[in-house]
Structure formats: structure tokens, C-alpha cells
UniProtKB/Swiss-Prot annotation:
Keyword Protein biosynthesis: yes
PROSITE patterns documented for this protein: SUI1
Protein name in UniProt: Protein translation factor SUI1 homolog
Top-level division of the source organism's lineage: Archaea
A Pfam family per the record: SUI1
Example of a GO MF term: translation initiation factor activity
Disulfide linkage: none
Family in the record: Belongs to the SUI1 family.
GO biological process: formation of translation preinitiation complex; regulation of translation; translation reinitiation
Lineage: Archaea, Methanobacteriati, Methanobacteriota, Thermococci, Thermococcales
This protein's UniProt keywords: Protein biosynthesis, Translation regulation
Length: 99
């Protein structure tokens, strides 16, 4: 349950703390015709705009992708770069598991 926050500064601090507590799992899935997708799960879609995070990641990685079903899907294998990029967005690197 999220506490009621009145002060906008408190809300920003609360979101930063939430980012640092997210357990994120990154792995790949095989799609049709041998194509690969990088899947990012574990980001709370009620607290964070998955579409906005996906948009930033797609721009940095120069790939296509989407946010659906509570996860982010990126075209291609980006496991080697995704941990650093999520850390730049404020998520804790220690809580990002890359398979």
C-alpha cells in the first residue's frame, strides 16, 4: 500500500526510494523466425510509466520494442547494456538480475 503523499518533493523522494527497491529480471526470449527479444520484468507498473521507460531504452539502444503485460520487450539481445541503462534511470544495479 502506498502512503498518501501531499508534498511534491516527498513524492519525488518516494519514487526514488521505490526505484532503488525494484527487483528487476532481464532475459531473452526467442521469437518467430529465430528473432530474439530482451524482456525486462519486475518494474512496478502502478508506480512507474513502463511506456516512458521503454521509450527511453528504445532511443538509447536504437531498437524497437513495447511495454505490455507488465513487462518491457525490446527487439534484439541487449543484455550486455541494459543493466547500465537501467542504473542511469535510477534503478539499483545490485537488484538487476541479467540471465
Amino acid at each position: 500500500m502506498v502512503p498518501r503523499i501531499v508534498n511534491p518533493l516527498d513524492e519525488m523522494l518516494f519514487k526514488e526510494v521505490l526505484k532503488e527497491q525494484q527487483r528487476i529480471k532481464v532475459y531473452i526470449e526467442r521469437a518467430r523466425y529465430g528473432k530474439v527479444k530482451t524482456i525486462i520484468e519486475g518494474i512496478d507498473e502502478k508506480e512507474f510509466d513502463l511506456e516512458e521507460i521503454a521509450k527511453k531504452l528504445k532511443a538509447k539502444l536504437a531498437c524497437g520494442g513495447t511495454a505490455k503485460n507488465g513487462r518491457i520487450e525490446l527487439q534484439g539481445d541487449h543484455r550486455d547494456r541494459i543493466k547500465k541503462l537501467l542504473a542511469e534511470l535510477g534503478f539499483s544495479e545490485e537488484l538487476i538480475e541479467v540471465e
